[in-house]
Amino acid sequence: MITSEEIKRRLWSGANDLRGSMDASRYKDYMLGLMFYKFLSDKTLETFQATAGLPKEADLVQEYSQAYEKLGENLTGMIQEVLGYYVLPEHLYQSWVKDIRNGDFELQKVMDSLNTFERNIAVKGDADDFKGLFSTSIIDLTDSALGSDLNKRSKNIKDLIFLFADLNMVDLQDGDVLGDAYEYLIGQFASSAGKKAGEFYTPRQVSEVMAQIVVKSSKIKSIYDPTVGSGSLLLTVGKHLTKNDQRDLHYYGQEYITETYNLTRMNLLLHGVRPEKMDIKNGNTLAQDWPEDPERPDEGVQFDAVVMNPPYSDQKWNKREDKPLKVSDPRFADFGVLPPDSKGDFAYLMHGLYHLGQKGTMAIVLPHGVLFRGGAEGEIRKRLLEKNYVDAIIGLPSNMFTNTGIPVCVMILKKNRELSAPVLLIDSSEHFVKIGKQNVLREKDIAQIVDTFVNKTETKGYSHLATREEIIANEYNLNIPRYVETLDNEIVQDVDAHLLGGIPTKNIADLKVLNSSVKDVLDESLTPVREGYVKLNKSVADLTDEVLEDERVKNKSIKVATKIKDYLHDYWQELTTVDSETELENLRQAMLSDMKQILATFDNIDVYSGYQIIAEIWKNTLTHDLELIAGLGFYNAGRTREANMVTKGTGQKKHEEQTGWIGAIVPNDLIAQNLYAEQVQSIANLKNKLTETEGSLSELVESAKTEDSDENVILYDLIKKNKDDEPQDSFDNKKIKAELKNVDKGSTDYDLLKKVSSLMNQKTKLNTEIKNEEKALEGAVYERIEKLTDAEIDSLVYQKWFGGLKAAIVNLVKEPLKNELQTLDTLNERYATTLSDLEEETKKVESEFESLLSELVVR
């Protein structure tokens, strides 16, 4: 069984190997297009199998071909009634694979297959859902970028076809494995394409923020993205709905770029969205307002949710059509002004707002300039605020997008806000981790944004609820720093403390965690030196020991540990009995939510750090393992081993080879450490001896390099040299053996040479023993995987998933205490040396200098 992560790695590795020098933004159309055609072929065969009542082991390609010869259009018509499309037997993806294996492959057949598919669906009502997906303007198999001649192009396409050949796209569609792999590839292509990716990709973390906020704000049956790109925003919103609500959800979107428009349709279909539940249009969103209600032409169709990531500061927003838009356009009329020609940000916002239902929620990504720029944009912003549409503004980190490094914000808009409701401003610009070239929101950053929005909480330095009066006082300027003060963690220097010594008591009062947790311990460690200043009467190291060993801290740690133990006990049964991949996301969300609730009951613990720990466990182990458990069962998965494939060679010789076996969910190293502890210790002992031996040899080499030493005279010529005759870091064993024959036994030379020879022999012997014992241990582990008992699997998997969890969460109790103790140490060092100390030191140096001068004799 293959997991989603393994599919992603395999496909992206294949893409990198196959695309050569072709631009990533172009190659994606070929790869994703053929991946989608494989899906269409597999769905055709699955529908035929179900309709014909054939068993799973049937040769579906052969059965389908024979049935088509008998029934012809009656068969394909029946399949089309179910799917909205069909692929003819001779044009199945599987027929390409068969031709390749038989040596009969022709590139023309692929082109014919793609063209025939489009012709066959053109006469049906679902034609718009598939029209143009495989047009030659998108997938041009004659493009020289695929190869300089027909043979090279044919080889490259054959390799690409084989990349998907053994994947059952129908099986992978269950649990969204296929859709997730497709989205992953889009993201990877976007990362590789850099600035060229801007038109089709919104980073997953930004989509998550927008989707979670929208879902928690409205009851959603229809969703619209006017600049839909790859469709990831629409799908992310859908993912956060219940299964029943997902089935009822209708997806709408519009996209200007044809290639990107195709990505959307394929993406939705691969995620299991039925054609009748999606309406995607290829066109200019602003110039061609869509969708329209024929019965209410001046109102436009309204949706429960609107999400979008439009082009930033689009300078051509009103120049792409013959007739420029006017302020009388119903989308803009309420505002009485058009955005400036050079910046189309508000044009997209007003378009989306026009299509937002009265009880709906809109989330849009915008550059920060819309928050404070004047002129027409200032007037539009004022109207938005006067109409009470702006619900929240979320400032995100810079450099999150592949196509721009500028910081952006997410604006949330609603039409049904209470008149007195404030505007929430969140500054999350410093909450991220850097991965490669991009800044990325962590799971905890997303959770904190969403929780702050839902609960409308104010946090110093992070969020603020701005009243109407505040906003008017700021002349409708919504620049986030005007409302959310950036926290400066640098402690202000105290002049008196520098002059006279002592730590300011106001700085001690700022140690909130120490004061609220162990105030008496802190107070006892301080001695007053004068009013407003104290000094430490013990080292910070001793104070740290006292604080961490205090009964209150230890009891709190025990309570937290007990809560975590109960938490894991409650979820263990669910995790080990999961039987459907569709359950995983709900289970993940439940574990994350419960961890937040548990930690929120304790003071001075960073709830979101605990949240991130659970998120990382899911990312690193649980998602992979639970996919296998859902398909195989817990104990069967525990006793399953897989070939350990490693990549060897480079260039055309690059290939994969099996080197042993690995446990599907139970790691080999855990089996070794827990069930073969004696063997592991024996190998460790041998490695320690090897390290000692190598150390002794290294010392002799260094001595031999030292001129005028006995070792230099005897051993220097026996050190290995490079081509420039420079000594290296080891002896030449052949020269050592030869030299031993030339010296007298019992001589100093002989004893030293014998010592080197013995050490080298010992090193060789130890290496051999280590290799043999490691090989024996590996073999034992390979055999043991399939023989693990249920109890062993319970213990080993628990250790793998949660072995370090309790300690990591308990550390959240100690971490804020340690941070403040570090601050105290910094303050102590800062004010340890006073002005009088410096003056005294200066006098001492001057006195020593004068003494030296007096000793000088002038001759």
Task: Give residue spans per PLM region.
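Non-catalytic, mostly N-terminal accessory regions of nucleic-acid modification and defense proteins
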Residues: 1-209, 214, 219, 282-285, ...
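Conserved nucleotide-binding/hydrolysis micro-motifs of P-loop NTPases
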Residues: 37, 258-259, 286-287, 311-314, ...
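Hydrophobic alpha-helical scaffolding
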Residues: 150, 171, 227, 250-257, ...
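Hydrophobic alpha-helix feature that most strongly marks membrane-spanning transmembrane helices
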Residues: 242, 269, 273, 311, ...
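Conserved NTP-handling cores and scaffolds of large molecular machines
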Residues: 22, 38, 44, 185, ...
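Conserved S-adenosyl-L-methionine
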Residues: 196-308, 313-317, 321-324, 329-336, ...
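Conserved Class I SAM-dependent methyltransferase catalytic core
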Residues: 17, 23-39, 338-413
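Flexible, glycine-/basic-rich loop-and-beta segments that form/coincide
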Residues: 402-480, 484-500
